[in-house]
A protein has these predicted regions:
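Conserved catalytic-core motifs of eukaryotic protein kinase domains, centered on the activation segment
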Residues: 91-93, 118-123, 189-191, 294-295
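Active-site loop/oxyanion-hole signature of alpha/beta-hydrolase fold enzymes
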Residues: 109-154, 329
Length: 355
C-alpha cells in the first residue's frame, strides 16, 4: 500500500526559495554591519597623531579643501620638504634630517592634504590637487615666486614629480631641486586604465573599500610593505616606525587618498618638463630601492644631462630615513653651492627689512 505524503507539490521538504533568499540577505546584512562596525572601531581606537619633528613652530595653512599642517624651523634661505605618497605617509619621514637642515635653512615640512595631521576631505584626488596645493603653499607661506625669490626643495617619489612639473610651470618658484627616487618618466607616469578605474570604484565603495584599506594599512600590512618595498634593512623597521605609519593612516579620513593613488589618478608624466630644467637638479637614489629602482635614474639622466646622481648605499626608497648622514653629505654641498655669499645675504635681509 502506498504511503500518503503530506508534502505539497513543489515544497521540496525544506525552506522556500523566498526563505533562503531572505536568510542570505540577513546574513549579508549582518556581515556588512559587522565589517562597518569593525572599520569604525579601528578609526575610533586610533589615538591623535603627534608630529615626529621636534622643535620649530606648528602652523596650519588654510586651503579651500581644508587646513594643511606644517612645521617651520631654522633661519636662512627657505627650504621646502615634501613627503612621499602612500598609506600612513607624513612629514615624519624627515625626522632624521630635520634638525640638521634647519641649522642653515628656514625649513618647512608640510603634511599634504589627506595625510598626517592635515585635513583629509573626501575628494576625488588627482595630481592637480597636489600641484595646486604645493604651488599655493610656496607662494603664500614661503612667499616665493613672482619675483620675490626662490626656495630650495627636497621631495620624495611622486611628490618629486610634482615639484618637477611646478618648476617648469613657473621657474621663479624653486632654486635647487633635490629629487629622491623620483617618478614620472618610467614609473607612475601613465593615465588611469579601465581596470584601474574599477579599482578606484571598489576602494570608494562603502564598507568594502574601507575594509580593504584597513587590511592594507594594518600594522602587519604596513610592516610587510616597509620591509619589502621601502626600507633596505628590515632591522630598521622598528615597532615605533610601524606605529607612526599606522596612526597616521588611521586618522579620520585617512582612507580617502589611497583609491586615487592605486588607480593612477595621482600619476603625472614629467619627461618633457625634466628635459627643460636648466639649473642642475640632484637625483638621490637608494641603491636597494624596489618601488622605483635605481636603474630608473638612467631615464632621468638621458632626459637631462645636467642632472647629477647620488646613490646612497644600504638604502631603499627613503635614504634620508635609513642613511641620514650619507644623505646630508650628498645634499648639503649641493644646496650650499647655490647659497648667496654672506654679504649678499645681509644685503637681501636689509632690503627685506626696509620693504
Amino acid at each position: 500500500m502506498a504511503k500518503l505524503s503530506l508534502r505539497k507539490k513543489g515544497d521540496g521538504g525544506g525552506k522556500s526559495a523566498a526563505g533562503k533568499a531572505l536568510g542570505a540577505v540577513l546574513w549579508t546584512g549582518a556581515a556588512i554591519g559587522a565589517a562597518a562596525l569593525a572599520n569604525a572601531v579601528i578609526f575610533y581606537k586610533t589615538p591623535p597623531l603627534t608630529s615626529k619633528l621636534d622643535g620649530g613652530e606648528i602652523r596650519y595653512f588654510p586651503t579651500p579643501d581644508g587646513d594643511v599642517f606644517y612645521k617651520k624651523a631654522g633661519d636662512g634661505p627657505p627650504l621646502l620638504l615634501v613627503h612621499g605618497i602612500g598609506a600612513g605617509a607624513s612629514s615624519a619621514e624627515w625626522e632624521n634630517v630635520w634638525h640638521a637642515l634647519s641649522e642653515k635653512y628656514t625649513v618647512y615640512a608640510l603634511d599634504l592634504l589627506g595625510f598626517g595631521k592635515s585635513d583629509k576631505p573626501s575628494l576625488f584626488y588627482t595630481a592637480e590637487n597636489y600641484l595646486s596645493l604645493i604651488d599655493d603653499f610656496c607662494r603664500q607661506v614661503l612667499r616665493v615666486g613672482d619675483g620675490r625669490g626662490e626656495a630650495d626643495v627636497i621631495a620624495t617619489s611622486l611628490s618629486a614629480a610634482y615639484v618637477i612639473a611646478l618648476s617648469q610651470r613657473d621657474p621663479s618658484i624653486f632654486r635647487r631641486l633635490v629629487l629622491i627616487c623620483p617618478t614620472g618618466i618610467e614609473e607612475l607616469a601613465s593615465d588611469p586604465t579601465l581596470s584601474s578605474r574599477a579599482v578606484h570604484r571598489i576602494f570608494k565603495a562603502p564598507v568594502v573599500g574601507t575594509s580593504l584599506y584597513n587590511l592594507i594599512a594594518s600594522k602587519g600590512g604596513i610592516r610587510n610593505y616597509l620591509k619589502s618595498r621601502l626600507i633596505a634593512d628590515p632591522s630598521k623597521v622598528t615597532d615605533e616606525m610601524v606605529e607612526t605609519y599606522h596612526v597616521s593612516a588611521h586618522q579620520p579620513g585617512g582612507e580617502n587618498v589611497l583609491p586615487s593613488f592605486l588607480s593612477g589618478y595621482l600619476n603625472i608624466d614629467i619627461a618633457d618638463e625634466f628635459k627643460q630644467i636648466v639649473d642642475l637638479p640632484l637625483l638621490v637614489w637608494g641603491r636597494q630601492a624596489v618601488e622605483t629602482p635605481v636603474g630608473n635614474a638612467e631615464a632621468f639622466l638621458l632626459a637631462n644631462p645636467n642632472a647629477k646622481l647620488e646613490v646612497i648605499e644600504e638604502a631603499g626608497m627613503l635614504p634620508h630615513v635609513e642613511q641620514p648622514e650619507a644623505f646630508l653629505a650628498a645634499v648639503r654641498p649641493f644646496l650650499a653651492a647655490a647659497d648667496p655669499a654672506p654679504a649678499a645675504q645681509e644685503a637681501e635681509a636689509a632690503v627685506a627689512a626696509a620693504g
